C-alpha cells in the first residue's frame, strides 16, 4: 500500500504494521512542511517553537535545543530553558568557498551564543545557539552566499556525502558532481523553505513531492558517494551508498549498497546497527533512477507505525533483501549487474599537504572534534578566517570533522602554512591516536545526550595515548576510537574499533570488534561503566594486543581473533547474542 494513501492502519505486502504514528499525522497536516512556523516566529513570549513546529523546523535544517548546563538554574529562577536552534547546512560533498566561509564566520561571531563553527560527521557545518530573533536572518545570510539548509534534518534525504578532496583525480571530480546531482534530485520540492525564510512569493496551486511523497519518508535517509579505497564517509552508516567504479581514471558506474545505519535504542533489542547490503553494479546513466527507486521503495514500505523500526535497514530485514532489491529494479527499470571489485583500505584523513594532479596542493587540517573556535593559545577560528582572506581555492569539510584547504598554488604554500601554524591549525605533535578519535557534540546543546562526548574526548584520548606508550606501541600506531553521547550514533561509534555509547552521566557502554576500514559492527563488551573502568579495560586489552598480535594486526581484528568479543556478521542475529 502506498505511503501516500494515508490509511489509518499501515499494511505492507500483506503485513499489518499498525496505526500510523503521530509524526505521520504531523507531516500530513503540515501543508508541505509549512505548519504554523511563520506564526511561531512572531511569538516573542517564548524562545521556542510550539507543538508540531518543534518537529517541522527539522525539515528546514534546524533542531530546537537549549543550554543544558544552565537549565536547572533557569528553572529555579522560574525561566523557561534558553531555547535556541542548531542549524545544519546543506553542503553536498562538503565544498565551501572562502567568500562563503568568511560570511558564516561573521554570522557565528555576531549572532550565535557560542561563537563557533562546528564541522560534523555529515561533511557540513553547524551553527549552535541561534536565538529566535536571528533565525530568519541566518537563513537569509546563507541564501545570500548560495547556501541553504533544506532537508539536512527530518524524514528526508539528508546532506549527501562524498569522499573528500575531489580534485585529487578526475575520478574524484566526477564523483563529486554526481553527489551534487543526487542531492538535487532527492531534494523536497515544496516551496515552504523559500516562503518562510526568504520571504518568497506564495504561489497558488498545490505542491507536489513526486519522489518523497506528501508524507515524506518514514524516517531520515542518508546517502553517500564513496571512492575506494578510501572509506572516509563510512558507507555502512548510511541508507544508500554509491561506490565509485573507475576504468582508466574515468568513472563508469557505481556499486550500490543499501540499508546501513547505526542508531539504536538502549534496552530495545529490535533496534541495532547494521551494515549495508551490496545490490550490484549500475551504469552512470541509471544513477538518479536508482536513487529515486530506493527512496520511493523505502517511502512506501518503511514502517510508519513504529519510528524506532522505520529506517531502511529494518525494512530490508522485514521484507527481505532480495524482495527489496527486486522492487528497486522494477521501479528503476534496470537489472543490477554483479558488483565490480573494490576494496576499502583506509578511512582517516591524510593530515598535512598532498599534491593534486593539477599541480596544486591541498592541506588537511586536523580540527579536534570539528569545533572551530578561538581557544586559549589556539585561535583556530581566526586562523581559518585569515586563510580565507588570501586563499584562491576552496575549503573541503570532511566526514571526519576536519578541514581541507584545497587548490593552493605552489607559490602560496608557504604563506598558507605560516598562517596555519601561527594560529595552532598545524600541530606537529598531534598523535595518530588523536587524529583517529572522534566524538559527537552531546552536552551542553544536544537534548538527546545521556553522557558527555565532545567535552570528554580530548582528556580521554590523552589517557589512551599513555596506555599505548606504556605498552611500547610505535607512535604511528592507533585505535579507531569514537564516542557518542547517546545511542543515536552521530559520532559513528558503531563502526569503531573501540566505541563508547553514552548511557548516563559519566557512564558508557563499551563496544569492541570493529575494524580499521569501517566494515564491521562492534559488539558490546561491558555495559554502563565509568571512564575509569573503561581505561582499565583498555589497558589490559592493549597489553594483550601489544604482546599477542600478528604482524600489522589492528586492535579490532585482534579482539575478534583472540576471542575477546564475538564477530557481528548479521546484526539482527548477532548484535545482542
Curated annotation (Swiss-Prot):
Catalytic activity entry: hydrogen sulfide + 3 NADP(+) + 3 H2O = sulfite + 3 NADPH + 4 H(+)
Listed GO CC annotations: sulfite reductase complex (NADPH)
Pfam families named among the record's database cross-references: NIR_SIR (PF01077), NIR_SIR_ferr (PF03460)
Record-listed siroheme binding positions: 490
Cofactor(s) named in the record: siroheme; [4Fe-4S] cluster
GO terms for MF: 4 iron, 4 sulfur cluster binding; heme binding; metal ion binding; NADP binding; sulfite reductase (ferredoxin) activity; sulfite reductase (NADPH) activity
Pathways per UniProt: Sulfur metabolism; hydrogen sulfide biosynthesis; hydrogen sulfide from sulfite (NADPH route): step 1/1
Keywords: 4Fe-4S, Amino-acid biosynthesis, Cysteine biosynthesis, Heme, Iron, Iron-sulfur, Metal-binding, NADP, Oxidoreductase
Gene Ontology process terms (BP): cysteine biosynthetic process; hydrogen sulfide biosynthetic process; sulfate assimilation
Bound cofactor: record note: Binds 1 siroheme per subunit.
EC number(s) on file: 1.8.1.2
Xref: InterPro entries: CysI (IPR011786), NiRdtase/SiRdtase_haem-b_fer (IPR005117), Nit/Sulf_reduc_fer-like_dom_sf (IPR036136), NO2/SO3_Rdtase_4Fe4S_dom (IPR006067), NO2/SO3_Rdtase_4Fe4S_prot (IPR045169), NO2/SO3_Rdtase_4Fe4S_sf (IPR045854), NO2/SO3_Rdtase_FeS/sirohaem_BS (IPR006066)
EC class: oxidoreductase
Binding-site positions, [4Fe-4S] cluster: 440, 446, 486, 490
HAMAP family xrefs: CysI (MF_01540)
Family membership: Belongs to the nitrite and sulfite reductase 4Fe-4S domain family.
Record's function text: Component of the sulfite reductase complex that catalyzes the 6-electron reduction of sulfite to sulfide. This is one of several activities required for the biosynthesis of L-cysteine from sulfate.
Assembly mode: Alpha(8)-beta(8). The alpha component is a flavoprotein, the beta component is a hemoprotein.
Descriptive protein name: Sulfite reductase [NADPH] hemoprotein beta-component
Name of encoding gene: cysI
Amino acid at each position: 500500500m502506498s505511503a501516500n494513501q494515508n490509511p489509518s492502519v499501515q499494511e505492507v505486502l500483506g503485513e499489518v504494521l499498525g496505526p500510523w504514528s503521530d509524526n505521520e499525522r504531523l507531516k500530513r497536516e503540515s501543508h508541505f512542511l509549512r505548519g504554523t512556523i511563520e506564526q511561531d516566529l512572531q511569538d516573542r513570549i517564548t524562545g521556542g517553537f510550539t507543538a508540531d513546529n518543534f518537529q517541522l523546523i527539522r525539515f528546514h535544517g534546524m533542531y530546537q535545543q537549549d543550554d543544558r548546563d544552565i537549565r536547572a538554574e533557569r528553572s529555579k529562577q522560574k525561566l523557561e530553558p534558553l531555547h535556541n536552534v542548531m542549524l545544519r547546512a546543506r553542503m553536498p560533498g562538503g565544498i565551501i568557498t572562502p567568500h562563503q566561509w568568511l560570511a558564516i564566520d561573521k554570522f557565528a561571531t555576531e549572532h550565535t551564543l557560542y561563537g563557533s563553527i562546528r564541522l560534523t560527521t555529515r561533511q557540513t557545518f553547524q551553527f549552535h545557539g541561534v536565538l529566535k530573533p536571528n533565525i530568519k536572518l541566518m537563513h537569509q545570510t546563507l541564501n545570500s552566499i548560495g547556501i541553504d539548509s533544506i532537508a539536512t534534518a527530518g524524514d528526508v534525504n539528508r546532506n549527501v556525502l562524498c569522499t573528500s578532496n575531489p580534485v585529487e583525480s578526475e575520478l574524484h571530480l566526477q564523483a563529486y558532481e554526481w553527489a551534487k546531482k543526487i542531492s538535487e534530485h532527492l531534494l523536497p520540492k515544496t516551496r515552504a523553505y523559500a516562503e518562510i525564510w526568504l520571504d518568497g512569493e506564495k504561489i497558488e496551486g498545490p505542491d507536489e513531492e513526486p519522489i518523497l511523497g506528501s508524507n515524506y519518508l518514514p524516517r531520515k535517509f542518508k546517502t553517500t558517494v564513496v571512492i575506494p579505497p578510501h572509506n572516509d564517509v563510512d558507507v555502512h552508516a548510511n541508507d544508500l551508498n554509491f561506490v565509485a567504479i573507475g576504468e582508466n581514471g574515468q568513472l563508469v558506474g557505481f556499486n550500490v549498497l543499501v540499508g546501513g545505519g547505526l542508531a539504536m535504542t538502549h534496552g530495545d533489542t529490535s533496534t541495532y546497527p547494521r551494515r549495508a547490503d551490496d545490490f550490484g553494479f549500475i551504469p552512470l546513466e541509471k544513477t538518479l533512477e536508482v536513487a529515486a527507486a530506493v527512496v520511493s521503495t523505502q517511502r512506501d514500505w518503511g514502517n510508519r507505525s513504529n519510528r524506532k523500526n522505520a529506517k531502511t535497514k529494518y525494512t530490508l530485514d522485514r521484507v527481505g533483501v532480495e524482495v527489496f532489491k527486486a522492487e528497486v529494479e522494477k521501479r528503476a527499470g534496470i537489472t543490477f549487474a554483479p558488483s565490480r571489485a573494490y576494496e576499502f583500505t583506509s578511512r582517516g584523513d591524510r593530515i598535512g599537504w598532498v599534491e593534486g594532479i593539477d599541480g596544486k596542493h591541498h592541506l588537511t587540517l586536523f580540527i579536534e572534534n570539528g569545533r572551530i573556535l578561538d581557544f586559549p593559545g589556539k585561535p583556530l577560528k581566526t586562523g581559518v578566517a585569515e586563510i580565507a582572506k588570501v586563499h584562491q581555492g576552496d575549503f573541503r569539510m570532511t566526514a571526519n570533522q576536519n578541514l581541507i584547504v584545497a587548490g593552493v598554488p605552489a607559490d602560496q604554500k608557504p604563506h598558507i602554512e605560516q598562517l596555519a601554524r601561527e594560529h595552532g591549525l598545524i600541530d606537529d605533535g598531534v598523535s595518530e591516536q588523536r587524529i583517529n578519535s572522534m566524538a559527537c557534540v552531546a552536552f551542553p546543546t544536544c537534548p538527546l545526550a545521556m553522557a558527555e562526548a565532545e567535552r570528554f574526548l580530548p582528556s580521554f584520548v590523552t589517557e589512551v595515548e599513555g596506555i599505548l606508550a606504556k605498552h611500547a606501541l610505535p607512535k604511528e600506531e592507533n585505535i579507531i576510537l569514537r564516542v557518542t553521547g547517546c545511542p543515536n550514533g552521530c559520532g559513528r561509534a558503531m563502526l569503531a574499533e573501540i566505541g563508547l555509547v553514552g548511557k548516563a552521566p559519566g557512564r558508557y557502554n563499551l563496544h569492541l570488534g570493529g575494524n580499521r576500514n569501517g566494515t564491521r559492527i562492534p559488539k558490546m563488551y561491558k555495559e554502563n561503566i565509568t571512564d575509569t573502568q573503561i581505561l582499565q579495560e583498555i589497558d589490559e586489552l592493549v597489553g594483550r594486543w601489544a604482546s599477542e598480535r600478528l604482524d600489522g594486526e589492528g586492535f579490532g581484528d585482534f579482539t575478534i581473533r583472540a576471542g575477546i568479543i564475538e564477530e557481528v556478521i548479521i546484526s539482527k542475529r548477532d548484535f545482542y547474542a
